[in-house]
């Protein structure tokens, strides 16, 4: 059984326990890469489950993706997905704020992109989803802001990350702030 939904870690672990009790092999294998990655066959799968179950699932996942990462036991795929998307959510906000500040300071967006994409500000949110038209031809900003990953989907993942943070006793103030901001963007 391969579960590629993005759900909370505890539910993924419970589903795994139920599947194993029924004699099934199971992995949680949430996906990153969006519709473009699906079309290109370059999806990333973050896989949680027993080593033997991962070995059984890997050839199937390899038909859809180019990055298949065994993150650990049951629930680890979900944990990797929500942690990764928390990084993305926070970095998208930081990149957007930096471009807004640059504009107010009179700095050309292309020049900020050239600097940040070659310096310590380099990140996927900048080089793939730059929020201003021009620097990245394939970004939503150059496609009339047609999303590849909707605000509400990011909000869902940030909520899952905050739920996991509370459950694990982890403090993630930037993740919490990002969740609050995406809730505002969603309305």
State what each model feature region is:
Residues 3-85:
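Rossmann-fold dinucleotide-binding core
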Residues 56, 76-187:
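Helical "substrate-binding/catalytic lid" subdomain
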């Amino acid at each position: 059984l391969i579960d590629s939904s993005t759900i909370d870690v505890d539910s993924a672990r419970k589903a795994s326990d139920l599947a194993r009790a029924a004699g099934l092999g199971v992995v949680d294998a949430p996906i990153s890469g969006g519709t473009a990655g699906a079309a290109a066959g370059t999806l990333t799968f973050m896989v949680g489950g027993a080593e033997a179950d991962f070995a059984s699932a890997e050839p199937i996942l390899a038909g859809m993706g180019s990055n298949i990462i065994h993150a650990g036991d049951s629930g680890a795929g979900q944990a990797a997905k929500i942690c990764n998307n928390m990084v993305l959510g926070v970095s998208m906000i930081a990149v957007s704020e930096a471009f807004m500040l640059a504009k107010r300071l009179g700095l050309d967006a292309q020049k900020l992109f050239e600097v940040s994409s070659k310096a310590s500000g380099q990140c996927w949110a900048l080089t793939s989803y730059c929020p201003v038209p021009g620097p990245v031809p394939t970004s939503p900003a150059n496609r009339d802001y047609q999303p590849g990953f909707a605000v509400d989907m990011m909000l869902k993942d940030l909520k899952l990350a905050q739920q996991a943070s509370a459950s694990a006793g982890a403090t993630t103030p930037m993740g919490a702030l990002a969740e609050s901001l995406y809730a505002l963007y969603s309305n």
